[in-house]
């Protein structure tokens, strides 16, 4: 949740201060990538807004990023800006995903017990992304190709 405070000044110099909480994941400067999401599970699958996504190397299809995957999709490459509900087994859906920009890291959704740390492995966090307590700036995987494990 982000807290937004607005100050409105009236002609008589009195102030009205409005504070509201807004669920905001995507903050600014976001870039998108279009592609196809494919449900590779045996049953229904829901991709939530903020879901961390990976890309299958052989097919180029987007799937939920899972640290145990061996098909290339264990690398976090993008974030879903919307919910994809009840995708049936093997269903393919055209998607537009966020692959760069600033997002609220509290809004990220991971698979199972995965965390950002389990997905990026030994790569130093400050090399992979610029983070602070409220948000992080995603970089595409090509931007991090020169970084080694520490």
Predicted regions and their residues:
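Surface-exposed, low-hydrophobicity beta-strand/loop segments enriched in small/polar/acidic residues
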Residues: 1-150
């Amino acid at each position: 949740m982000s807290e937004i405070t607005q100050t409105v000044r009236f002609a008589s110099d009195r102030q009205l201060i409005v504070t509201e909480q807004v669920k905001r994941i995507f903050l600014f400067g976001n870039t998108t990538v279009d592609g196809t999401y494919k449900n590779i599970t045996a049953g229904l699958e829901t991709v939530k807004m903020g879901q961390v996504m990976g890309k299958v190397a052989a097919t180029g299809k987007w799937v939920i990023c899972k640290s145990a995957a061996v098909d290339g999709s264990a690398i976090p490459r993008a974030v879903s800006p919307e919910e994809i509900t009840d995708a049936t087994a093997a269903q393919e859906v055209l998607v537009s995903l966020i692959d760069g920009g600033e997002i609220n890291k509290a809004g990220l959704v991971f698979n199972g017990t995965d965390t950002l740390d389990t997905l990026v492995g030994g790569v130093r966090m400050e090399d992979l992304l610029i983070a602070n307590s409220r948000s992080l700036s995603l970089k595409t995987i090509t931007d991090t190709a020169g970084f080694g494990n520490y």
